Amino acid sequence: MKDKRLIFAIVVLVPALLVGLVFAFEATVGISFLIIGLALLAISSEKAVEHSIGIATALKLSPLMIGLVVVSLGTDFPEIVNSIISSALDHVDINVGDSFGSVLTQMTLVLGLFPFIGGAFRVKREEIVVMGACQVLAFIASVSMVEKGYISRMNAFFLVASWPLLMLITRNMMKNSPSLGQTSGRFSHHLLLSVLGFIGVAAGAYTVVQSVIALSAVFSVSEYFVSFFIVAFGTSLPEIVVDLTAIRRKQYEIAIGDAVGSSIIDAGFSIGIGTLFFPGKVTAPLAEKTGLYALTCSIVVVTMLALRQKHDRKTGLLFIMLYALAYLAIFALF
């Protein structure tokens, strides 16, 4: 009897225990590297953006232009690098999932937190309409392209080229906006630290991509879902940190410009830049449905801000609820 128990333990329990230990080890390593990568992204992006603002103010750009172009490029650098690396590794689902998820996060969660941190403030209807329309147009183009299940180099070129075109459309709106004045510190100092910050972002993005691939394999979960929910939140941390800091300093135009500007980049440029060099397949059903939900939320957000011309805790709560509902709405579709 004892021999049978010993044989059972050796044949069944020991292998099961070893499998469990290997699973736990791989999961722990994957999660650890994901956290390290996201932390590196957040810290590096904050420094890169801080000194990018220094460069922009030295050039006497307006607050809205700083937020819409300069800061948004800086805070969106994780998504841009993630797009290139994931596409190069033939994991376009990570690229699209991260970009679409980032649009949802920035247009709902990030914008929704503004009035809870800095109180209610006014928004200019024409500014939010023009910026919002650009974001929605770019997103419509992206969603229509991913539904085919493949992003070609021509599709990617269109998405990348649309960003400077959309920025030109908004240029006239910001001509009369006052600049922030002179910045402290030397221009070369800000330039050097910005470059170092962006290098840190690139390293963090590579770590995140590798950890997502590993975790998806360990838990048998779609790379797209992990990217849409977890990675997108992580790569949106720079927007959250920078924008909430700007809100506390009453720099509302920088915060609004960055949140919407980052969404414009994510909706087109971010997806396109990786697939421009490395075209590839994407899981069309997932991308289409998640993209349509994020697009609907974007339209609701822009419409509410344009109609009310102010952003308070009522609209903030609505936007945060839209973000929370994404988890229920999207999982209910599959």
What is each model feature region?
Residues 1-334:
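Hydrophobic alpha-helical segments, chiefly the membrane-spanning helices
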